[in-house]
């Protein structure tokens, strides 16, 4: 009896979560995206970097996989409508950086920013992206 109630509760939660998700569909097209980011720090602007990444609704946070960035962990990802927010923490390879980001998708493009602290310096990374085609 308890097992049947537990299964019923689980199925009810899955149905509820599916209905909530369907009602707040993200306006974003899965596929390969070209992402341009520019880091700004006090007294310094770093030239823009462009990279490509396969982005999906399930994995909607742009991640630059440059050398030294592979120990970064994204957490607290939240989606509200077409806006995705997240936190990121990087280990020693990336200089113990931590930050928070937010981007808003508009179908085949997005814009947003990430604020972070790296080695005691505050940084703002402005990001924009455009879908270039399907993922390989």
Q: Where are these predicted regions, by residue range?
A:
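Edge beta-strand at a domain terminus
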Residues: 118-136
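Bacterial N-terminal signal peptides
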Residues: 8-18
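Short beta-strand segments that buttress and anchor functional surface loops
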Residues: 35-37, 85-92, 112-118
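Bacterial N-terminal signal peptides that target proteins for export
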Residues: 1-9
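Tryptophan-anchored aromatic micro-motifs
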Residues: 28-42
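Short, surface-exposed coil-to-beta transition loops
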Residues: 48, 95-100, 111-113, 122-126
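N-terminal helix-cap/turn-to-beta initiation motif at the start of protein domains
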Residues: 20-32, 78
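Central antiparallel beta-sheet cores of small beta-barrel/beta-sandwich binding domains
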Residues: 47-100
């Amino acid at each position: 009896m308890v097992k049947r109630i537990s299964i019923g509760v689980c199925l009810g939660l899955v149905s509820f979560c599916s209905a909530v998700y369907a009602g707040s569909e993200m306006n974003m097209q899965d596929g390969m995206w070209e992402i341009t980011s520019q880091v700004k720090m006090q007294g310094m602007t770093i030239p823009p970097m462009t990279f490509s990444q396969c982005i999906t609704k399930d994995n909607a946070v742009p991640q630059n996989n440059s050398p030294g960035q592979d120990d970064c962990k994204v957490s607290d990802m939240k989606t509200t409508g077409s806006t995705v927010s997240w936190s990121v923490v990087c280990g020693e390879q990336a200089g113990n950086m931590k930050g928070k980001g937010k981007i808003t998708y508009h179908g085949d493009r997005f814009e947003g920013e990430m604020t972070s602290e790296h080695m005691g310096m505050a940084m703002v990374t402005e990001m924009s992206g455009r879908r270039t085609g399907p993922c390989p």
